[in-house]
């Protein structure tokens, strides 16, 4: 993990996001139709796993980003396997693909630009305080 002034804040926020993803993934499905689009669920998967990847990329140096991506992908795979066993949820291979797209997009952005972003935010907050 990179040197942060408020590591507990960043970690607890990130793990709260993970817990929320786990909770939503194992809860009974709530039907929602915001845009009445068939791919809405897949877009939600891409965005969720993209944001998870970006969040945790802010906590670790660039050389650890692939490990972060493996963790986030493993989380998505694990949750899909749990859904396979739940009577009120269902497994969909396209969800794994959407998760992977989100993680890879987040990995690309973190390797290119955003790795360690938490440290840069803390630096700017100290400068303006």
Sequence positions of predicted segments:
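"…centered on the first transmembrane helix and the immediately adjacent amphipathic helix/loop
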Residues: 1-56, 68, 72, 128
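Membrane-interfacial alpha-helical segments at the cytosolic side of multi-pass membrane proteins
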Residues: 47-62, 103-113
């Amino acid at each position: 993990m990179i040197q942060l002034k408020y590591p507990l804040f960043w970690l607890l926020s990130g793990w709260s996001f993970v817990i929320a993803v786990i909770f939503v993934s194992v809860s009974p499905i709530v039907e929602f139709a915001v845009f009445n689009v068939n791919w809405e669920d897949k877009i939600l998967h891409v965005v969720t796993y993209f944001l998870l990847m970006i969040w945790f990329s802010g906590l670790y140096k660039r050389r650890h980003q692939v490990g972060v991506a493996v963790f986030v992908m493993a989380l998505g795979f694990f949750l899909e396997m749990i859904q396979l066993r739940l009577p009120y949820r269902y497994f969909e291979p396209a969800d794994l693909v959407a998760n992977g797209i989100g993680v890879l997009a987040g990995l690309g952005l973190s390797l290119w630009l955003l790795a360690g972003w938490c440290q840069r935010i803390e630096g700017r907050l100290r400068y303006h305080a």
